[in-house]
Design a protein with these regions (language model features):
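Structural marker of alpha-solenoid helical repeat scaffolds
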Residues: 48, 82, 116, 150, ...
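Structural signature of tandem alpha-helical TPR/SEL1-like repeats
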Residues: 66-77, 99-112, 132-146, 167-180, ...
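Terminal, low-structured helical/coil segments at or just beyond the last alpha-helical repeat
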Residues: 38, 476, 547-583
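Helix-start (N-cap) detector for alpha-helical repeat units in TPR-like alpha-solenoids
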Residues: 46, 53, 87-88, 121-122, ...
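N-terminal leader/linker segments that initiate helical-solenoid repeat arrays
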Residues: 30-92, 99-104, 108, 115, ...
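Position-specific recognition of the canonical hydrophobic site in helix A of tetratricopeptide repeat
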Residues: 64, 91, 98, 125, ...
């Protein structure tokens, strides 16, 4: 939220003129009085003092013309000695002290000014601004309310009030206040703009778009409204419209780094890595090595499998306290990408315990230790993590993974069940338990745990597919299996796994023509998966397409997720049949 605060209170020539009038009036005060004979000496002394005050006042004005504010303060203080009850002089001094950064003296003078004359709107504005500078927002709000008590239609005070409410996250109050401005001035550009901003803050994106578009109708070149309208489009994932609006900002402000940075972010979301990198490079050049831009360029390099380039971007950020830990974490990821597991492990170990990256860094470190055959160290790290982060599901999932890799199903199950009662959202743990029980050939327990996932997340497509495929494998509840898998396919229409499951349900139902359509589609999406290839080969076999079946069985033996023993048996049987056909 942009803090516009109160207007900076500059010395004004109008105020100077008023002060001159006051001073001249006081100097001429005794001209019309009849003086008694004994009062002549006293009167001459007073006249001399007032003449001196007038001299200091003129000197103060000269200092202001020369922007010598410290000199003006000295001269005004001299004037104040002769005219201590001038509310306007106190106000002028308060403004000068504010300009010089002496908030304590500014407060003292403005408060004295208001004590002398409590109806000065300018003084309340200045006092409110001082309170904002001290982050005393409630006090500032009270001062603006005083302005409105004197002038209920004061739009400036209402606008500042609205921005203060927004700073306090009191957005309903901020919105009401801005709407009161628009009732007074329906075509207020600033009013519609801030209303749009506050709607964005409260996730009322449609209303925000309407207000910001209204702002641009009233002032086609109002750049802040363009920028925030782009943000609104981005929030709604209307990325192309957001890009159009950000580029419109750049037509007015070619070096607007926020617009370039947001363009880079949107392009990154759209996987347009080259264009995103160029946008962030522009930010980096404009901001003279902007760390955020360098960080984002590093991320893009990682996404593009350019680990050395990524490391070059991240290394300078190790000296930046804001980015240090994140940079170290991503340097470790880049080293992993390079295959330098030992160096990556060292970087993960250096991530500070107080950083957000500590837990993911430790989990990656344990995983790399396990890959490097340092299994005891890996488990030691995970034991430490279960004590440090007992509520994090990823800790238990990683620990169980190590046991799964060694087919130690019971140990994996025990770890997950320990975490099941500690994490807030155990869906992932339930899902993993279902998978492990499936591997353990305990399908009843597997089904029980996947149903727990669906109780918590009825529309979870992976859980729907898992249960549907499990039913299909067992040849039970095939209509329910088809319903579950079709529901999953709506959420993930291009998932090869789910398409394979649907084809396998058709196969189990004996609907081979329908099965082959889905399984060929799945195989096209996942040509390296042995299970999909085997399912398609089984279907070809049922359709008497024997040469195609044999070719695909042989191909499946070379793929991942295959059962070579079972495949060899099928190949031998089919080869025998084909030899018989050729006799």
């Amino acid at each position: 939220m942009q803090n516009i605060g109160a207007p900076h209170f500059h010395p004004r020539r109008l105020l100077a003129a008023v002060l001159i009038l006051e001073l001249v009036s006081s100097l001429a005060g005794c001209a019309s009085l009849g003086l008694r004979p004994g009062e002549t000496a006293q009167t001459e002394a007073e006249e001399s003092a007032k003449g001196l005050a007038y001299y200091h006042f003129l000197e103060a004005q000269q200092c202001l013309l020369e922007d010598d504010f410290a000199g003006a303060i000295r001269e005004y203080e001299e004037v104040l000695k002769e005219d201590p009850n001038s509310a306007r002089l106190e106000l002028e001094l308060a403004a000068l002290y504010q300009r010089q950064g002496d908030i304590k003296k500014a407060l003292a003078h403005v408060e004295k000014s208001l004590k002398l004359d409590p109806k000065q709107q300018e003084a309340y504005f200045l006092l409110a601004g001082l309170h904002v500078g001290l982050n005393q927002l409630e006090e500032a709000i009270q001062e603006y309310e005083q302005v409105l008590a004197l002038d209920p239609d004061n739009r400036e005070a209402r606008l500042f009030l609205a921005t203060l409410y927004a700073q306090q996250r009191r957005f309903p109050k901020a919105i009401q206040t801005i709407q009161s401005i628009l009732r007074l001035e329906p075509d207020s550009v600033v009013g519609h703009y801030y209303l749009g901003r506050f709607f964005i803050e409260t996730d009322q994106i449609e209303e925000a778009k309407q207000e910001l578009q209204r702002t641009l109708t009233l002032d086609f070149n109002f750049v802040p409204a363009m920028f925030d309208l782009a943000v609104a489009f981005e929030r709604e994932k209307q990325y192309n419209r957001a890009l159009v609006m950000y580029h419109r900002v750049l037509r007015h402000q070619p070096n607007n780094t926020r617009a370039w940075a947001n363009i880079g972010r949107v392009l990154l979301i759209q996987n347009h890595y080259g264009d995103a990198q160029r946008a962030f490079a522009r930010v980096k050049s404009l901001e003279k090595g902007d760390p955020a831009a360098g960080f984002n360029i590093g991320i893009i390099n990682l996404e593009q499998k350019l680990p050395d380039d990524a490391i070059r971007e991240f290394r300078p950020l190790l000296s930046n306290p804001r980015y240090q830990e994140r940079a170290r974490y991503y340097i470790a990821l880049a080293l992993e990408e390079k295959g330098d597991l030992k160096a990556a492990t060292r970087e993960y170990q250096l991530v500070s315990r107080n950083s957000e990256q500590f837990i993911p860094a430790r989990l990656r470190m344990a995983f790399l230790l396990y890959q490097q055959k340092e299994k005891d160290r890996a488990r030691q790290v995970m034991d430490e993590m279960q004590k440090l982060a007992p509520n994090r599901e990823e800790v238990y999932l990683t620990s169980s993974y190590f046991y799964e890799e060694e087919n130690l199903w019971d140990q994996a199950i025990n770890v997950l069940k320990e975490g099941m009662g500690k994490v807030e959202n155990p869906e992932e743990i339930y899902f993993r338990l279902a998978v492990i029980y499936e591997k353990k050939q305990d399908r009843d327990e597997s089904i029980a745990y996947i149903k727990k996932v669906l109780e918590l997340e009825p529309d979870n497509p992976d859980a729907q597919n898992f249960l549907g495929y499990t039913y299909a494998e067992q040849g039970i509840n095939l209509d329910e299996a088809e319903r579950l898998i079709r529901a999953a396919l709506k959420a993930k229409p291009n998932s090869g796994f789910i398409i394979d499951s649907l084809g396998w349900v058709y196969f189990k139902k004996g609907q081979y023509e329908k099965a082959v359509v889905e399984l060929e589609r799945a195989y096209h999406l996942m040509p390296q998966d042995g299970t999909v290839a085997e399912h398609l080969a089984d279907t070809y076999l049922r359709l008497k397409r024997l040469p195609e079946a044999l070719r695909l069985y042989r191909r499946a033996t070379e793929l991942e997720n295959s059962n070579p023993t079972e495949l060899r048996k099928k190949i031998n049987e089919l080869e025998f049949r084909l030899r018989g056909h050729s006799l």
